[in-house]
């Protein structure tokens, strides 16, 4: 019986293969997935695909040139009119012309690409912005309070023999921090100022003063813990952007380029120290006035250099044109008049500071009195300009020949 059953099963299996049936002798024991299975006739699917391809070919004929079209090329949108050139209405607004970037005045550098260095310097001025109207955010403060604080920071820098760069870093940190806050009271100004100087000294000085020394100069108004707390608050508010190109940094570049030698080596300063100190004293006075925040640091340094040199030299070493600095130069006139009346101070020498670095140490003069004189002159000049406005542009004396001819005509 078993033998006959096996023969019968083999015959049935052979018969099913001949009729085109599937081999069902081996069955899967796995459970079927709980998903529906859609069956479709293969011939029917192929017929649909052919029909779709034919319809696409008939609607979009093949173009030999389309195979060579650049995938990044501009393809106009159908049924859309081309945009005509924008026409500005005749209003008070006039589109400003895009000025080319300032050309690099730097000499050839053997340690870097001068164009790359100059580009980084220009980007610094775009990154580190200040607000000239930051006092509007603090109704309880006045511009005089800022001047008193910065004058005191200059005195602290001279006592601890800190560099000019350290002071101007602290000034930048203070102004940018105040622009990010609101409703600061007067009693916090000294803490903010000394904390800004504490941060700047750790960035710039090789041997910065200790924390207790900064607390000591406040005469008990600020403790070390308060300075550390304010330091963290300031750095968070400044988003840890602590490397601006300060006013004195720009001045250092301009004066160095003006006195660069024929070899083009600029690894060490090669300019007269007295010239640098004279221009720096003008900037020390200008920075006490809150109006200086209206101008970029590079413009302030170039304007100060203009007051002690010439337009040609300023253009050569800074890349600015007269129209770029005209407003700042006129704003700086009363401050320059006060500095000239005072006369240039002698170069100070500090114990333990090398002679070649003495011009970089921040000094302190009776700056608040000079500021009062400058603001008084500014008021007088403003009244004179209101009565008879001066012509715009650079004022130059006439040639000697024209001057003689005019004198003969008057006779």
UniProtKB/Swiss-Prot annotation:
Main function: Essential for the control of the cell cycle at the G1/S (start) transition.
Organism: Rattus norvegicus (Rat)
The record's account of how the chain is modified after translation: Phosphorylation of both Thr-396 by GSK3 and Ser-400 by CDK2 creates a high affinity degron recognized by FBXW7, and accelerates degradation via the ubiquitin proteasome pathway. Phosphorylation at Thr-77 creates a low affinity degron also recognized by FBXW7.
Region of interest: Disordered: 1-44, 381-411
Source organism superkingdom: Eukaryota
GO cellular component, as recorded: centrosome; cyclin E1-CDK2 complex; cyclin-dependent protein kinase holoenzyme complex; cytoplasm; microtubule organizing center; nucleus
Residues modified as Phosphoserine: 104, 388, 400
PROSITE patterns (UniProt xref): CYCLINS
InterPro entries from the UniProt entry: Cyclin, Cyclin-like_dom, Cyclin-like_sf, Cyclin_C-dom, Cyclin_N, Cyclins_cyclin-box
CDD domains: CYCLIN_CCNE1_rpt2
Name of the protein described by the UniProt record: G1/S-specific cyclin-E1
Quaternary structure annotation from Swiss-Prot or TrEMBL: Interacts with CDK2 protein kinase to form a serine/threonine kinase holoenzyme complex. The cyclin subunit imparts substrate specificity to the complex. Found in a complex with CDK2, CABLES1 and CCNA1. Part of a complex consisting of UHRF2, CDK2 and CCNE1. Interacts directly with UHRF2; the interaction ubiquitinates CCNE1 and appears to occur independently of CCNE1 phosphorylation. Interacts with INCA1.
Swiss-Prot/TrEMBL keywords: Cell cycle, Cell division, Cyclin, Nucleus, Phosphoprotein, Ubl conjugation
GO BP field: animal organ regeneration; antral ovarian follicle growth; cell division; cellular response to nutrient; chromosome organization involved in meiotic cell cycle; DNA replication initiation; G1/S transition of mitotic cell cycle; homologous chromosome pairing at meiosis
Family as reported in the entry's similarity comment: Belongs to the cyclin family. Cyclin E subfamily.
Subcellular compartments: Nucleus
Modified-residue entries (Phosphothreonine), positions: 77, 396
SUPFAM superfamilies found in the cross-reference section: Cyclin-like
PANTHER family: CYCLINS
Gene Ontology MF: a single term: protein-containing complex binding
Gene3D superfamilies, A to Z: Cyclin-like (1.10.472.10)
Stretches with biased composition (Basic and acidic residues): 1-20
């Amino acid at each position: 019986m078993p033998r006959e059953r096996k023969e019968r099963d083999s015959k049935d299996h052979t018969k099913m293969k001949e009729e085109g049936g599937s081999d069902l002798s081996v069955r899967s024991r796995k459970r079927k997935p709980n998903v529906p299975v859609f069956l479709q006739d293969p011939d029917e699917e192929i017929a649909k695909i052919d029909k779709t391809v034919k319809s696409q070919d008939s609607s979009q004929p093949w173009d030999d040139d389309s195979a060579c079209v650049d995938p990044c090329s501009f393809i106009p949108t159908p049924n859309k009119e081309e945009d005509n050139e924008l026409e500005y209405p005749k209003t008070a607004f006039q589109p400003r012309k895009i000025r080319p970037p300032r050309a690099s005045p730097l000499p050839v550098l053997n340690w870097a690409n001068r164009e790359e260095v100059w580009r980084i310097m220009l980007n610094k001025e775009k990154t580190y912005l200040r607000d000239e109207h930051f006092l509007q955010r603090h109704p309880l403060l006045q511009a005089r309070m800022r001047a008193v604080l910065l004058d005191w920071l200059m005195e602290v820098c001279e006592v601890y023999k800190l560099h000019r760069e350290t002071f101007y870093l602290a000034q930048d940190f203070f102004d940018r921090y105040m622009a990010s806050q609101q409703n600061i009271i007067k009693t916090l100004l000294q803490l903010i100022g000394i904390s800004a100087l504490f941060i700047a000294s750790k960035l710039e000085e090789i041997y910065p003063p200790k924390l207790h020394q900064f607390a000591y100069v406040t005469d008990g108004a600020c403790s070390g813990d308060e300075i550390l707390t304010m330091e963290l608050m300031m750095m968070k508010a400044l988003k840890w952007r602590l490397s601006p190109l300060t006013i004195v940094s720009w001045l250092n570049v301009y004066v160095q380029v003006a006195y660069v030698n024929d070899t083009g080596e600029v690894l060490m300063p090669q300019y007269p120290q007295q010239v640098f100190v004279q221009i720096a004293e003008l900037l020390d006075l200008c920075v006490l006035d809150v109006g200086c925040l209206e101008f970029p640091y590079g413009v302030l340094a170039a304007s100060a250099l203009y007051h002690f040199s010439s337009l040609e030299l300023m253009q050569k070493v800074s890349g600015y044109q007269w129209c770029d600095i005209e407003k700042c130069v006129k704003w700086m006139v009363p401050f320059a008049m006060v500095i000239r009346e005072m006369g240039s101070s002698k170069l100070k020498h500090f114990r333990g500071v090398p002679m070649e670095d003495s011009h970089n140490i921040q000094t302190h003069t009776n700056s608040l009195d000079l500021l009062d004189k400058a603001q008084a002159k500014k008021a007088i000049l403003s009244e004179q300009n209101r009565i008879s406005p001066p012509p715009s542009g650079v004022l130059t004396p006439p040639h000697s020949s024209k001057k003689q001819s005019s004198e003969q005509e008057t006779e």
